[in-house]
Amino acid sequence: MKIVQNTVLKMNGLYKIYFTGEYDWTAKESPFLYLTCELPPPPLFRDEHYNNIIPQVSLFTILNKFNGETEKEYKTYKDNLIRKFELTKLPPYIILYIKRFTKNTFFLEKNPTIVNFPVKGIDFGDFLAEDAKEKHKDVNTSYDLIANVVHEGLPTSGIYKVHVLHKGKSQKPTSLTLKKN
């Protein structure tokens, strides 16, 4: 994965964000075990019927982070960084981690956003860098879902369940419950 970043300068106590053409980007190659996808923040208000709104987002929407064009701001203890991510090589298996839990000053929150994704034929070819597309031209860039791990319950408690596609059992997913120690 190629990570391109720039430091946001702090001037007079305020952060100055430059436009894309006004500053230098630094790029580095970084191997990855999984891709971290961030969910959009949940809505603050209820709908007109006073029901909680559970937003839905497509998998391809949260994967746009890796298209090499989308800029994301990250804060560290000493700097603010703007980063862009681009895939340079596709592994045999891709693990997607959807960041659902956030911790603020007071407590841990769980984002209830539903992620809609296809089970078969997820194409990662669009997220490859231009030079990597040439290398993967004759290679299949589509992936099928093999397993899914979900958390059920409150952020501080609950259980994790894994759904595994077992080809020997007529392609039906098997559900397993993982106990928390």
List each language-model region with its residue ranges.
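Cationic, amphipathic, low-complexity alpha-helical segments enriched
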Residues: 3-11, 174-177
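Exposed regions on extracellular, virion, or secretory-pathway luminal proteins
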Residues: 1-2, 133
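Exposed substrate/partner-binding surface patches
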Residues: 21-181
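Detector for methionine-enriched segments
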Residues: 1, 11, 33-35
